[in-house]
Amino acid sequence: MALAGLPPAAPLPCWTEVCPLSAREPATDPSGPPLDAYRHNLPRPMSPLIGRSGELAAIGACLDANRLVTLTGAGGVGKTRLAVEAATERTSRDAIRCFWVELATLRNPDAVASAVASALGVRETASEAAVTAIARFVGDRPVLLVLDNCEHVVAPCADMAGRLLARCANLTVLATSREPLGVPGK
């Protein structure tokens, strides 16, 4: 403290805001505390969201009433940004964990579940499929899973989301896509 020019009893400014996400370790035991070690891995916007409060409120209402919500629209209309804001609001309001999965660069449709497992820090094994490992990791804990840019992997996203929702009672999925996922009951 003296080297920083601060008196010995001075509080350290804002250090805790930087550490939680950078200190996150990948989960090795899907049943354990790593899920509770942090609240989210959401991207941080560079600027505030302006003029979209109506859409944001509607998304919040949809998330309150449904376990799977897909934000659809043409490219560039702000689906991703709205998803970030809606997920941020939800993690701030509720005691849930949120996992962001960016799918835009995914080239292999068969790798969707593996990409989600990786984002959650879940390690697949030869004897356990990715969806099974993810479901075991999430369990009955309240989790919001955000799948961004699903349009080029709609079918595998829909399949995985349906299977996870059937296994995880407190899981909610928010997806962004140029077309609906088409999961029954959505």
Residue ranges and their predicted role:
Residues M1-D29:
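An N-terminal, helix-rich hydrophobic module
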Residues P11, R52, K79-T80:
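Short, conserved phosphate/pyrophosphate- and ester-handling motifs at nucleotide-, phospho-/glycolipid
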Residues C19-A61:
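Conserved adenine-nucleotide phosphate-binding loops and their immediately adjacent elements
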Residues A61-A65, A87-A95, V131-K186:
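A conserved switch/coupling segment of P-loop NTPase cores
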Residues V69-T72:
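Short hydrophobic/aromatic beta-strand immediately N-terminal to the Walker A/P-loop
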Residues A74-C98:
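P-loop NTPase Walker A phosphate-binding motif
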Residues A95-I96, W100-A115:
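AAA+/P-loop NTPase substrate/partner-engagement loops
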Residues P109-T125, G139:
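Conserved NTP-binding/hydrolysis module of P-loop NTPases
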